Amino acid sequence: MLYCLKKEELQKLKKTHFMPEFVNAEMLSATYVTDENAAREIIPKPLLPTKTPLATVFVARYPETNFGCIYNEGALFLHCEYKKERGLYCLSMPVDDDMAMVGSREQYGYPKKMADKITVEKTENRVVGSVIRKKEEILRIECELTKEVPSNFMDDVGVQTEDWDGTPCYRVIAFLYKYFPSPGGMGFDYLPRLVREATLMRKKGEVLEGRGEVKVSSSPFDPLGDVPVKEIRNIVYGKWHNTMLPGKVIGRAWNPFKFSKHAFFKTDVVPTLLQNYDPSAEKRAREIMKVARKF
């Protein structure tokens, strides 16, 4: 009974030692130089922008996972550092499956939202990745593949290592803030937690690079255009076997009021409230809220 698991079922879950696996993940990614002032303003302390302001985007197809989801995904990250360790601060991660959205959002704090359509399309040497949300194409990567990637192609994003079986892979670190609003609508449920989550990426066959274009666009709900493309470092396409490793809390926002300016991009509610704000209605709304809290 899923609503109330038996003791032996709970024990089985514990003994699975589950880590999300993405087999034959088809990924089109790009790393580019972005605006230094934007990176400095967006990245919350104690995370620090990298010396060269970099961003990474990707569009991916996940045809096989070990958690029952087949889905597509896009993402935007700003490169950052924490205590001299390089990582990626996630700003956007649209998906097209509700369970894929819930999992990483609730456990790690990824800013996942449901998209209208996410595609990766390859014809001969041309690859196009696209993310459409709220009827707007917010991310598009186009590439003409030309050659195999050099051995150091992941240096901006991760480090070379080996997994527990000795398989060569790349370790990519994501930094995220995990938080929930309080039930009463005032502040946070708990102090926002800074989470470190590592992913191992193993090449599955040939990984290619090429020339192309990256477009990040803004809508009222998805301001990806705030991280503009200044210069493309690389565009890469290939298939991977990825494993998301257990995350860990490495810090907290001890001043939640100061942190709060970074806490409103994970939902679409705030842009709507700001757009519909009416100063003349403020007094009556405050009176109603005061009464509502007594029910």
Residue ranges of model-derived segments:
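Short, extreme N-terminal leader segments that mark the start of a protein/domain
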Residues: 1-50
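Interaction-surface and assembly-scaffold signal
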Residues: 9-10, 106-295
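A general secondary-structure signal for short beta-strands and their flanking turns/coil
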Residues: 25, 71-73, 124
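Structured loops at beta-to-helix junctions and adjacent beta-edge loops in soluble globular domains
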Residues: 33-35, 60, 79-81, 94, ...
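Short, structured protein-protein interaction patches enriched in aromatics and acidic/basic residues
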Residues: 50-81
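Broad gene-expression machinery/nucleic-acid interaction feature
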Residues: 73-77, 90, 126-128
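Short, positively charged
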Residues: 85
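Short, solvent-exposed aromatic-acidic interface loops
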Residues: 91-102, 134
